[in-house]
Amino acid sequence: MPGASRFRGLALGIISLGALAADQFSKHAVETHTAVGSLRVVIPGLLNLVHTSNPGVAFGLFADSENPWRGPLLITFSVAVIAMLVWLLATGRAGGRLGECGLALILGGALGKVLDRFLRHSVTDFIDCHIGDHHWYTFNLADSAIVLGAALVVLELFREQAHPNQEPA
């Protein structure tokens, strides 16, 4: 049904663009209203807003690298991942609805990351989750979209494994 697949594509596009918009809006708000390094306690002992700039990759890896190719390589890799995600979604190879929604969220998060690297040469992180003095790495909404998307893809894989002869939803 062409109408159904067009609607599905539109819905997945809205999910991706929604994740991208939420990510970029939140980063703009943090960059506009807080100084780099500033800390705001949101929930004592659990959640802070900390404005940081990460020129590296996940968990700050390669942030201290002086290699002039770091930025272009990260952008090139990100664009390749984005192209693969678009191809998977466009060709219907994402599995069922959970897998498609998951890949759409990952796509939105990846777009947010590559846009940051292209425009700012770094990624703005600001969410600091912790329990007492035990802090997780600071992250942003693009990271959240990618992690949530990956969880949905894994759930889709479990669903497919539990019902191998069932058509993807």
Residue ranges and their predicted role:
Residues 1-169:
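Alpha-helical transmembrane bundles and membrane-interface segments of multipass inner-membrane proteins
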